[in-house]
């Protein structure tokens, strides 16, 4: 080694740290996703290599997509493939904890494949050069890296004799297949699918080659690489073609292909020319799950209603705007279209506020999504919602869609408005003072002996879900009024007033009121209020979760019947519980046409709220099943509780039925043993 001046070492340390530190930012995330795609393909190639003798017996040439399908359905080979999937995070899971639940008895193939994947995710392809070959900054006596992942590009973290630096490896492409030819062919099939073809150069690899196919796309009239999405892996195949069924009209697609074997890859081909489907884009889907989010009362007695809906997941063209029509109805008969009122909201917005509606009235709302394709407007089917602003009729709301029967409205916030002023109790106009929203409650004294009152105020619900439990405040006053302070915007409150002494004839009186939204209040009063906390309504989360999932099995006359039971946690339910959704799935690696290993054959059933047991007949012996239970409420689904169970073996002389059948979860019998 050459002796260096002390100052040079410091300068080298600073420079190396700057240029070879851990990569960060969007580019690093893209590189990490690319490395993971290559690693899973190397993992798959290894599994095929281990079975190459068997594969050759079935196929004249193992470089055929049938070889991958064969491996997916072969007992040992499918176990090897299981860790190669991209659906699990190796950093958060140990190989033992991943493989044992799937293969409790024999998991050697899974474990060795998992350890190989773990190794290649941390160690880049190629070999470190000899320490004495390091030169320039790579020869600096510094510890600038600890792992290959800290080095950019293809560089590896290598020793130089007195430290570790990022260095260009040797034998980078030893045994690695050549890149495919960059020209890709696109064939649009009559079914609407797209077939992408490529060809390979002379293959120097004796191991099976996995082709990783990625794509990106942009929306618009013209192709654009600047506005394109990130590259996403759409297929891994051993064939030199892939057929894609999720091609959308109006998108400009680009593809690239990499050839990978167990030793590594030379990277992707250059991005292909742009491809766009010749199909015309479809009209947007009709808005779904239209519902009432909130109803609030105005000072003049009118009512504001907030309507919300679910945005479509992936239309051919993004929704440009929504048309909202509403009209007063009589006995659910809609008035003529000429008298309908209309609003337009932006495409990304999923709610609208209908202002100035009359109390104790029926209304019908129609909603339609609109997209633009050049000069053409594409419109969805209309969906409608019938609702009432009268409190007595709040449970009679109906949701209808064109050509579909009415569905029950999921109403997370019960329809409410300010009650008619009672004889004794009234609510004043909300006002803003001392940086607080306040309101005055006042009442009439009917007895001169009443000189002290209890005032209970209860926060019932808020549109923005900012309630800290159910906040209840009790105060005493000698006056015939009380100013309620520190109120929240867009919330429903209940106020109850009763005499401090129970001997009085004055009975407890209650009144409901709804505070205005921050933005509406600010606009009317011109107050300087910070409305940053007011957001688009977020429905209260369902916190209730099934617990203590257990299973027992009864074997009778060659049939296995499973009894699954659970308990419910004592979480606060913001909405009434309507039942349970139970999904059970067979986790299998058996040979099934067009199926992947660990494919899930699932069935689902809705149980009433008082049913905590599910009975499933005709289960398969010695099979792993996944049970998933969710609490259902009027406001949505709770978090799922998932557990794996394995059915017992059948005695050798007993036949078994190989198919799952629909069942009815009744007549639960206590099982002999639990799992």
UniProtKB/Swiss-Prot annotation:
Residues 1-21 form the signal peptide. CDD domains: FN3, WAP. GO terms for cellular component: cell surface; extracellular region. Disulfide bonds join 43-77, 47-71, 80-99, 84-95, 110-114. Residues 121-170 form the WAP domain. Keywords: Cell adhesion, Disulfide bond, Glycoprotein, Protease inhibitor, Repeat, Serine protease inhibitor, Signal. Residues 388-413, 654-675 are annotated as: Disordered. May be an adhesion-like molecule with anti-protease activity. This is Anosmin-1. It comes from Gallus gallus.
